[in-house]
């Protein structure tokens, strides 16, 4: 959850 926000990578849209 917060991990995705921490990583400045492109999320799976």
From Swiss-Prot:
Main location: secreted
Organism of this sequence: Litoria peronii (Emerald spotted tree frog)
UniProt KW DNA damage keyword: no
Domain of life of the organism encoding this protein: Eukaryota
Cell location: Secreted
Family recorded in the similarity comment: Belongs to the frog skin active peptide (FSAP) family. Peroniin subfamily.
Annotated Gene Ontology cellular component terms: extracellular region
Stated name of the protein: Peroniin-1.2a
Gene Ontology biological process terms in this record: defense response
Tissue: Expressed by the skin dorsal glands.
Positions where Valine amide occurs in the chain: 13
Keywords: Amidation, Amphibian defense peptide, Secreted
């Amino acid at each position: 959850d917060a991990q995705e926000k921490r990583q400045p990578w492109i999320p799976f849209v």
